[in-house]
Amino acid sequence: MAEELSAATSYTEDDFYCPVCQEVLKTPVRTAACQHVFCRKCFLTAMRESGIHCPLCRGNVTRRERACPERALDLENIMRKFSGSCRCCAKQIKFYRMRHHYKSCKKYQDEYGVSSIIPNFQISQDSVGNSNRSETSASDNIETYQENTGSSGHPTFKCPLCQESNFTRQRLLDHCNSNHLFQIVPVTCPICVSLPWGDPSQVTRNFVSHLNQRHQFDYGEFVNLQLDEETQYQTAVEESFQVNI
């Protein structure tokens, strides 16, 4: 299928994954100057936090783009035509349906946990039947995140595989890849738990793989972790009215 995709278009499977959330693109938008593509939600959140720069290459993004990014309709159409392999069960799924598949893929849930990077806190029940995440629990996680933030401004974590502590996200990633790469033990991800949408009952089967897939960047660079999703997007909408189109 990958060969068919390459032969028919100039795209590869990697082009269908958002560089911010590292998931299959949802409502893809494209920057005008550097032509990088992101999920619309990821892009708007990044613009809210990082200002005038592309989240990937730090290229300039116009004021109009920051409020109303251009849909990558060509890419959306390609995603409706071609399939790719689920990263866990290897089932062939149309790219535009991949996120929906993750919600019902038990292997994906076991491997990576909750499939949405910035979930809706009002969802009453997740895809595997876990209890809903309330705004109160999100507030508790924000307090935990702040308490774990060191003098450098970056939160620190304990390795759940050896209990060594005081790791920043990057140091934890390096530590686990160096010392626990082939250690597959069900644990709870300390980074996920510290985030406003984190679920302390969510167990990750392969922690090191989860780190490499989910935590290659600091969420705080793209998301204001003291605001819930609804507040962030309401702010983005309000700011869009101030843009001179």
Swiss-Prot record:
Matches recorded under Pfam families: zf-C3HC4_2 (PF13923), zf-Di19 (PF05605), zf_C2HC_14 (PF18574)
Q: Which UniProt keyword terms apply here?
A: Acetylation, Chromosome, DNA damage, DNA repair, DNA-binding, Metal-binding, Repeat, Transferase, Ubl conjugation, Ubl conjugation pathway, Wnt signaling pathway, Zinc, Zinc-finger
In this chain, the RING-type zinc fingers fall at 18-58
Which GO biological process entries does UniProt record here? DNA double-strand break processing involved in repair via single-strand annealing; double-strand break repair via homologous recombination; protein ubiquitination; Wnt signaling pathway
Modification N-acetylalanine occurs at: 2
**One GO molecular function term?**
zinc ion binding
Please indicate if the UniProt record lists Transferase as a keyword.
yes
Q: Might you give the EC number(s) for this enzyme?
A: 2.3.2.27
Q: Does the keyword Calcium apply?
A: no
**Which residues are noted in the entry as Zn(2+)-binding?**
86, 89, 101, 105
List where in the cell it is found. Chromosome
Q: Which reaction does it catalyse?
A: S-ubiquitinyl-[E2 ubiquitin-conjugating enzyme]-L-cysteine + [acceptor protein]-L-lysine = [E2 ubiquitin-conjugating enzyme]-L-cysteine + N(6)-ubiquitinyl-[acceptor protein]-L-lysine
Top-level taxon of the source organism? Eukaryota
Q: Which GO terms describe its cellular component?
A: site of double-strand break
Give the multimer and partner information: Interacts with NLK. Interacts with XRCC5/Ku80. Interacts with RBBP8/CtIP.
Tell what the record comments on domains.
The zinc finger domains (C2H2-type and C2HC-type zinc fingers) bind DNA and mediate recruitment to double-strand break sites. They show strong preference for DNA with 5'- or 3'-single-stranded overhangs, while they do not bind blunt-ended double-stranded DNA or poly(ADP-ribose) (PAR) polymers.
Name of the protein: E3 ubiquitin-protein ligase RNF138
Q: Source species, please?
A: Bos taurus
Q: What is the lineage of its organism?
A: Eukaryota, Metazoa, Chordata, Craniata, Vertebrata
